[in-house]
Amino acid sequence: MSLFGLSLGRLLEALRCLPGVGPKSAQRMAFHLLESDREGGRHLAQALLEALDKMTHCQTCRILSETDLCSLCADSRRDRGQLCVVEMPSDVQAIEQATSYSGRYFVLMGHLSPLDGVGPEALGMDLLAKRLDTDQIREVILATNLTVEGEATAYYISELAQTRGITTTRIAHGVPLGGELEFIDSNTLSHAFQSRRHL
């Protein structure tokens, strides 16, 4: 129990569910909102509730969207023959901001991790396979993180694509090993994307 009561204790616990937020950071945020910016706290709570109510996943690419078909999938100007596979929705944001890529996406919502019980079915590989079978895709661009799990996931997807005769490329290693796309600077990510290689 918090020294200041149950409400503050619940707030501190709730803030700690965010990535990278430990006890001290949660305490700083909570005290700031309660002592200095109550209006900001109300706005944050309202925006979070609205996002939780309205946001879903695009039925085609699985990015976060307010509609069943996101704006990227609905855009007829995008190249339907290229499909970029990423781990998380934030990776799509990073690529869109840093590159001139104009194809489509598929978001895995993670990576293969047998030790954690994350297999192909948990990542929507059946949906990806269906897209590979029906969407007339010429090239699959693998933009998973350059970690052991990301590489294993990329290899699995390359096998799916290559058995269907689809060219498979991997973003270049301008991104440091162990790096996560959302934290890479725009120039490095742009160079890595332009220098992708065949698998």
Swiss-Prot record:
One of its GO terms (molecular function) is zinc ion binding. A zinc finger (C4-type) spans 58-73. Pfam families: RecR_C, RecR_HhH, RecR_ZnF, Toprim_4. Residues 81-176 form the Toprim domain. May play a role in DNA repair. It seems to be involved in an RecBC-independent recombinational process of DNA repair. It may act with RecF and RecO. Belongs to the RecR family. HAMAP family: RecR. Signal peptide: none annotated. Keywords: DNA damage, DNA recombination, DNA repair, Metal-binding, Zinc, Zinc-finger. This is Recombination protein RecR. PANTHER family: RECOMBINATION PROTEIN RECR. SUPFAM superfamilies: Recombination protein RecR. One of its GO terms (biological process) is DNA recombination.
